[in-house]
């Protein structure tokens, strides 16, 4: 007894778990019933992971579990409902990556308990097929347009006209959802709900139904449905705007701007709870914004709108054909008798193109005629597909097709049961079943191998996409080395520029010295015995060693230098400039020595006083103070740099 009591309490806790978590979110403080209902149902949708399943996956689950062949008023047990929900979540986990797998057992328990609480309040343990379809189609994810198209297919007849009785039944089932989250007083079912949607009793086609349901505003009883879809779209929208009440620096979700107060904007939490401050009042009209535009985009849009460049708004939904597609005529096809425990497997094998044993189709002598009719129907169906692009888009057509297949399968099973078969048929059926089992086993093994290979490739892709710690550690080192190399490059470029500038200054000094020496040699009245009177100054000897500046050519480095130095250094692009400079300095020194000798021989006759300079190897004449003087700067023979020679090595001539 104690164990039974504990199990009952555990079961009751599981049934109330979703509602306890929903109350913890404190949605009841939202003052507007529409937003309060939409937030609660959105919470249930996300908590049950229904937002990951779209309407097409729901339709596939309905067909896999045979709900499309059942009448809407048929009741199913809770155990079968649990099977349907389990197939939905297990198929969902197959589509999701391994890193985003959901807890299937928990999701099944939450959704099953919520559906029982919403649609089986009396505790009968049974739900109608239409209730299950309406609830799952409303609460699943995906586009609202696709949901409404599927819902209309469940409420329309073969001519594509909506049946108001079916619409009333749908509203009765759909409005049980707000009642389940304690919003029945605001959005409970009433007998006049159909008239609020379609006041005029007239023929309602698909396009008119979509226009009404997707209008702004929508019907009052279903106003929470499009709002729930908008909540899903703006959950992650970021607004870099400060809230005027709570002063948060940014907003997520909806943003509300007052139409009367200047630059007064509220986040969704403050607006939903009715907060207001300053001159703003809750009675002011607010505009709901689901995105943020920069001032530049606003200005561009305003200019485009004023110039008429803004395109017209697209319609809320495409226009669908008024007449529904006619279902396929399968009267000439007699499908094979499905096995009791292999129905789903055989359907999957036939759809995947795997050849199945054809001997099971030979139930009589008219088998060639049946195959001929089947091929003719397939050919006509292919021709129809080539001319119609929306054949496969109609859920009603597929439902009728499955219903027709099931009816012929049942008739074939009844005929086969009444037939008396010879003993050879039993052995043949046994062989056919054995072949089927072998084929199924082979396909299951192959499917298992394919799933393992997919899992392995997925793990390799995830490992390759994630950065390893070694790469993360190498990146700072590489950045530091790159920074040092750039710094070293800048230093070398600065050093090279300084050397080029020093070299140019030295060339300018040499040019001035050579001009001065040439002028002195030309103006001298006496000549040396070893030098003729009209002989010009000897040019420096060119060096044969190769070498050039890496970034500047010879003409660039000698810019601003006179013709004599350029003539001495311009030729020979591959030589050592340092050695050339030393050779040029030696030649100038020799020329100076010759000039001093000539001056000494000439001045000895004019001036009797001669003084000897300790810095000069030859006696130098003492020139009067009024004589012009010049200074020549020579590079030292012991240095190997291109910088100017210090004053201690300078020779002065008077």
From Swiss-Prot:
Tissue note = Expressed in neurons. In the isocortex, expressed most prominently in the somata (including the nuclei) and the dendrites of the pyramidal cells. Expressed in the hippocampus CA1, CA2, and CA3 neurons, namely in the initial segments of dendrites. Expressed in the Purkinje cells, molecular layer interneurons, and granule cells of cerebellum. Expressed in axon fascicles associated with the spinal trigeminal tract and in the internal capsule in the brainstem.
Q: List all membrane-crossing ranges.
A: none
Q: Where is this region: Disordered?
A: 520-562
The PTM entry states: Phosphorylated by PKA. Phosphorylation at Thr-11 alters the interaction with KIF5A.
Residue numbers of Phosphoserine PTMs: 394
Q: What is its main location?
A: cytoplasm
Q: Which residues carry this modification: N-acetylmethionine?
A: 1
Residues recorded as bearing Phosphothreonine in the entry: 11, 69, 179, 212, 424
Report ZZ-type zinc finger ranges.
238-294
Looking at the keywords, is Nucleus present?
yes
Quote the record's binding site residues for Zn(2+) 2: 258, 261, 280, 284
Keywords for this entry? Acetylation, Cell membrane, Cell projection, Coiled coil, Cytoplasm, Membrane, Metal-binding, Nucleus, Phosphoprotein, Synapse, Zinc, Zinc-finger
The family classification in the record reads: Belongs to the dystrophin family. Dystrobrevin subfamily.
Question: Tell me, what does this protein do in biology?
Answer: Scaffolding protein that assembles DMD and SNTA1 molecules to the basal membrane of kidney cells and liver sinusoids. May function as a repressor of the SYN1 promoter through the binding of repressor element-1 (RE-1), in turn regulates SYN1 expression and may be involved in cell proliferation regulation during the early phase of neural differentiation. May be required for proper maturation and function of a subset of inhibitory synapses.
Q: How does it assemble?
A: Interacts with dystrophin short form DP71 and syntrophins SNTG1 and SNTG2. Binds DTNBP1. Forms a specific complex composed of DMD, SNTB2 and SNTA1 in neuron; the interaction with SNTB2 and SNTA1 is DMD independent. Interacts with UTRN and dystrophin short form DP71 in the kidney and liver. Interacts with SNTB1, SNTB2 and SNTA1 in kidney and liver. Interacts with KIF5A. Interacts with HMG20A and HMG20B. Interacts with OLFM1. Interacts with PRKAR2B and PRKAR1A.
Q: What is this protein called?
A: Dystrobrevin beta
Gene name of the record: Dtnb
């Amino acid at each position: 007894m104690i164990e039974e009591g504990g199990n009952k309490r555990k079961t009751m806790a599981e049934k109330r778990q979703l509602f306890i978590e929903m109350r913890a979110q404190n949605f009841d403080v939202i003052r507007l019933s529409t937003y309060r209902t939409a937030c609660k149902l959105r919470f249930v949708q996300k908590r049950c992971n229904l937002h990951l399943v779209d309407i097409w996956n729901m339709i596939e689950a309905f067909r896999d579990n045979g709900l499309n062949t059942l009448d809407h008023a048929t009741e199913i047990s809770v155990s079968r409902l649990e099977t349907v929900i389990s197939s939905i979540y297990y198929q969902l986990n197959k589509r999701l990556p391994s890193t985003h797998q959901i807890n299937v057992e928990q999701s099944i328990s939450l959704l099953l308990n919520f559906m029982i609480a919403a649609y089986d309040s009396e505790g009968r343990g049974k739900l109608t097929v239409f209730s299950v379809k309406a609830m799952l189609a409303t609460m699943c994810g995906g586009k609202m347009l696709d949901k409404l198209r599927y819902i209309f297919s469940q409420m329309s007849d073969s001519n594509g006209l909506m049946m108001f009785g079916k619409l009333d039944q749908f509203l009765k089932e759909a409005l049980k959802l707000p009642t389940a989250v304690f919003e029945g007083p605001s959005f409970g079912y009433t007998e006049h709900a159909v008239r609020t949607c379609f006041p005029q009793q007239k023929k309602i086609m698909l396009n008119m139904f979509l226009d009404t349901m997707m209008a702004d505003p929508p019907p009052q009883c279903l106003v929470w449905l499009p709002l729930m879809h908008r909540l899903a779209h703006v959950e992650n929208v970021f607004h870099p705007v400060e809230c005027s009440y709570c002063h948060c620096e940014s907003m997520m979700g909806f943003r509300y701007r007052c139409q009367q107060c200047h630059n007064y904007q509220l986040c969704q939490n403050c607006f939903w709870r009715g907060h207001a401050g300053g001159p703003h009042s809750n009675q002011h009209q607010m505009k709901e914004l689901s995105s943020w535009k920069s001032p530049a985009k606003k200005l561009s849009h305003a200019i485009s709108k004023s110039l008429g460049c803004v395109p017209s708004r697209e319609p809320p939904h495409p226009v669908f054909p008024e007449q529904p597609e006619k279902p396929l005529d399968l009267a000439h096809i007699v499908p094979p008798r499905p096995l009791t425990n292999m129905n789903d497997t055989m359907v999957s094998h036939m759809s995947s193109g795997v050849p199945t044993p054809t001997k099971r189709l030979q139930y009589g002598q008219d088998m060639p005629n049946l195959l001929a009719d089947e091929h003719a129907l397939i050919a006509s169906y292919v021709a129809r597909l080539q001319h119609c692009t929306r054949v496969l888009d109609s859920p009603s057509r597929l439902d009728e097709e499955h219903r027709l297949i099931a009816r012929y399968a049942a008739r074939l099973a009844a005929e086969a049961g009444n037939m008396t078969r010879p003993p050879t048929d039993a052995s043949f059926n046994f062989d056919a079943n054995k072949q089927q089992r072998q084929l199924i086993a082979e396909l299951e093994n192959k499917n298992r191998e394919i799933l393992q290979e997919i899992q392995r490739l997925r793990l390799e892709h995830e490992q390759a996409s994630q950065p390893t710690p070694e790469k993360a550690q190498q990146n700072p080192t590489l950045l530091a080395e790159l920074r040092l190399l750039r710094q070293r490059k800048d230093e070398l470029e600065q050093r090279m520029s300084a050397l080029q500038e020093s070299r140019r200054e030295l060339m300018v000094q040499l040019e001035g010295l050579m001009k001065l020496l040439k002028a002195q040699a030309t103006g001298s009245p006496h000549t040396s015995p070893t030098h003729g009177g009209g002989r010009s100054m000897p040019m420096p000897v060119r060096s044969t060693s190769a070498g050039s500046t890496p970034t500047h050519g010879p003409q660039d480095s000698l810019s601003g230098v006179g013709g004599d130095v350029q003539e001495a250094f311009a030729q020979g692009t591959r030589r050592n400039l340092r050695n050339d400079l030393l050779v040029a300095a030696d030649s100038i020194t020799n020329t100076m020595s010759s000039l001093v000798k000539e001056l000494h021989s000439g001045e000895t006759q004019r001036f009797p006083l001669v003084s000897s300079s300790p810095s000069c190897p030859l006696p130098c004449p003492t020139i009067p103070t009024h004589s012009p003087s010049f200074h020549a700067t020579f590079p030292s023979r012991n240095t190997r740099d291109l910088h100017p020679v210090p004053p201690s090595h300078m020779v002065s001539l008077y």
